[in-house]
């Protein structure tokens, strides 16, 4: 089984990917974690590293090339990243999930997780990060990140807690996969 989980920052992709990986005994590969680690290794914030990635396309291109290779060569994985679904486009055997939530909800979640700055600062930072990513994806691949038509499942994580959202996703995934 191969699953991609995508969504904007703070939508719950990391949490739900971990829960899905546990439920289905799948390996979790998170490009967001790779990106955050690369930023830390350079002593940069996510916003600073995102700005660097805007100037240095090799950062995104390397991460995305790696994602594409993974989704086309490995089984029993969950690939979690903003573009994971797009990296699996054309693969009907891969279950593509988009997790969504309103901006203010996402910013509250990020602020709670990061515990570093005020809500207004986090809002500004998140909007800038999303603007940066949207621009890069459009420039590099012609991808409109707001077009959700490639996804098999789109779910709003604001409506339910993480476990309720997981239960809904499991029912949908099991229906798509069929009996084992």
From Swiss-Prot:
GO biological process, one term: pyrimidine nucleotide metabolic process
Family: Belongs to the cytidylate kinase family. Type 2 subfamily.
Protein name as annotated: Cytidylate kinase
EC numbers on record: 2.7.4.25
Molecular functions per Gene Ontology: ATP binding; CMP kinase activity; dCMP kinase activity
Annotated positions binding ATP: 7-15
Annotated keywords: ATP-binding, Cytoplasm, Kinase, Nucleotide-binding, Transferase
Annotated compartments: Cytoplasm
Gene3D superfamilies: P-loop containing nucleotide triphosphate hydrolases
Catalytic activity annotation: CMP + ATP = CDP + ADP; dCMP + ATP = dCDP + ADP
Chief site of localization: cytoplasm
This protein's encoding gene: cmk
Transmembrane segments: none
Catalytic EC class: transferase
Any one Pfam family match given in the protein's UniProt record, by short name: Cytidylate_kin2
Domain of life per record: Archaea
Keyword Methyltransferase: no
GO cellular component: cytoplasm
């Amino acid at each position: 089984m191969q699953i991609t989980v995508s969504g904007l920052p703070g939508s719950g992709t990391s949490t739900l990917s971990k829960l899905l990986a546990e439920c289905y005994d799948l390996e979790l590969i998170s490009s967001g974690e790779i990106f955050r680690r690369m930023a830390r290794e350079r002593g940069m914030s996510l916003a600073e590293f995102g700005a660097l990635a805007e100037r240095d396309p090799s950062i995104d291109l390397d991460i995305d090339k790696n994602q594409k290779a993974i989704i086309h060569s490995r089984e029993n994985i969950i690939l979690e990243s903003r573009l994971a679904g797009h990296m699996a486009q054309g693969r009907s055997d891969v279950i593509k999930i988009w997790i969504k939530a309103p901006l203010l909800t996402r910013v509250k979640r990020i602020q709670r997780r990061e515990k570093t700055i005020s809500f207004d600062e986090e809002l500004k930072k998140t909007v800038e990060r999303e603007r940066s990513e949207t621009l890069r994806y459009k420039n590099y691949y012609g991808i409109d990140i707001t077009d959700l038509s490639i996804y098999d499942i789109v779910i709003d994580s604001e409506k339910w807690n993480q476990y309720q959202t997981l239960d809904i996703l499991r029912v949908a995934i099991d229906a798509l996969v069929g009996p084992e």
